[in-house]
UniProtKB/Swiss-Prot annotation:
Phylogenetic classification of the source organism: Eukaryota, Fungi, Dikarya, Ascomycota, Pezizomycotina
Biased composition (Basic residues): 24-40
Name the record gives this protein: Pre-mRNA-splicing factor spp2
Main location: nucleus
GO CC annotation: spliceosomal complex
Family, similarity comment: Belongs to the SPP2 family.
Keywords for the protein's UniProt record, in alphabetical order: mRNA processing, mRNA splicing, Nucleus, Spliceosome
Subcellular location: Nucleus
Source species: Neurospora crassa (strain ATCC 24698 / 74-OR23-1A / CBS 708.71 / DSM 1257 / FGSC 987)
Length: 358
């Protein structure tokens, strides 16, 4: 045997099913869904082999059998999906740990703040001296001073400090002692009797009433009656006024009477304008005297009727616009006729105006 015969040979048999059984191979199984079918590579390989077979067999195509010798791991979809899943799980766990750490940091910071606040509050309470401590300290000082002055031993009961009441927050009311209450009660029960010579001082209200009700000695008897009736000792001081009260007030010099009730002495001060005459009936302040007959119902009427005009006998009604224009036109015509300036054109204009007025 030669060396070439001793070497193993790898042969791939291509042919129909009628070929020899020694070169028969198993039909390759159909690839699963996890394996990708490389169409380009197989098509190129198939085209090259078909060209060779055509050359050998004279252009006749026959079926072929392909033996698979190895399987590549780079195109495995299962492994890619597993990698993706593991990466997703890893990312989720990382995010979950990050959120947990963030929440834990927040809770830790909150607890730390609460502890610091409690510590500060406790320190403030311990450093702030209470009112009871100040009161007890002042009592001790007073007892020590009195002991040094007297140099006398005191009973242990007296030396004991009184029990301090618990602190009360908010509004505190100090109850008065019973001795002061009884003394004030006796003081109120036994008022000082005023002497006949001394008069009690008048209050502000009494002074105001006396100034309001003080009238001149020259006042009328009605004023004195009103003064007596409106004195502070009268019982009907708060009643409503009657017709008799209104009649008692004088109509003339009403303002002066009112001012006198408010304490005016009746003397005029400054520059005073004297009123020499009274106003006419139903005439306002500052109205002038009417020269003609005065009748309020005779407005817009002539003097020949019921009056209402001036002394010359002219109508006092307000002039209407039409009457004013008519009078002006008449005056204009008279002036034109007088100066001889009338013409045919002016006559036509007058006719048009007359037709328009109608």
């Amino acid at each position: 045997m030669t060396d070439q015969d001793s070497k193993p040979r790898v042969t791939i048999a291509l042919g129909t099913s009628s070929s020899s059984s020694s070169f028969k191979t198993k039909k390759p199984s159909r690839p699963t869904h996890t394996r990708r079918h490389h169409a380009r590579a197989s098509s190129n390989h198939y085209s090259s082999e078909s060209e060779d077979d055509d050359d050998e067999t004279g252009g006749q195509r026959t079926g072929r059998v392909q033996a698979i010798t190895e399987i590549s791991t780079y195109g495995d979809d299962n492994e890619l999906e597993n990698r993706d899943r593991s990466d997703r799980r890893r990312d989720r766990s990382r995010d979950r740990d990050r959120d947990r750490n963030r929440d834990g940091d927040r809770n830790r910071d909150r607890r730390r703040d609460n502890r610091s606040q409690d510590r500060d509050r406790h320190n403030n309470r311990s450093s702030r001296p209470s009112r009871d401590d100040d009161a007890s300290r002042s009592r001790r000082r007073s007892t020590s001073r009195s002991r040094d002055r007297d140099h006398k031993p005191k009973d242990p009961k007296d030396l004991q400090e009184p029990e301090t009441a618990p602190p009360k927050w908010g509004l505190t009311i100090n109850p008065k002692s019973t001795t002061t209450a009884t003394s004030s009660f006796h003081h109120q029960r036994q008022p000082r009797s005023p002497s006949p010579e001394e008069k009690p001082p008048q209050t502000l209200e009494e002074q105001a009433l006396s100034s309001l009700l003080s009238l001149d000695n020259k006042g009328s008897s009605t004023a004195s009656k009103r003064k007596r009736s409106h004195s502070p000792s009268s019982h009907d001081r708060d009643r409503s006024p009657d017709h008799s009260d209104y009649r008692a007030v004088p109509i003339d010099d009403f303002g002066a009477t009112l001012l006198k009730q408010f304490g005016w002495d009746g003397k005029m001060r400054g520059k005073v304008k004297e009123v020499t005459h009274k106003h006419a009936n139903l005439a306002g302040l500052g109205a002038k005297d009417a020269k003609g007959a005065e009748e309020l119902d005779a407005w817009n009427q002539k003097i020949s009727g019921r009056g209402g005009g001036d002394s010359r006998g002219r109508d006092s009604r307000p002039v209407r616009l039409e009457d004013y224009r008519r009078e002006e036109n008449k005056k204009k015509q008279r002036m034109e006729y007088r100066h001889g300036e009338s013409s045919y054109k002016q006559e036509r204009e007058r006719e048009r105006e007359r037709r328009g007025d109608r």
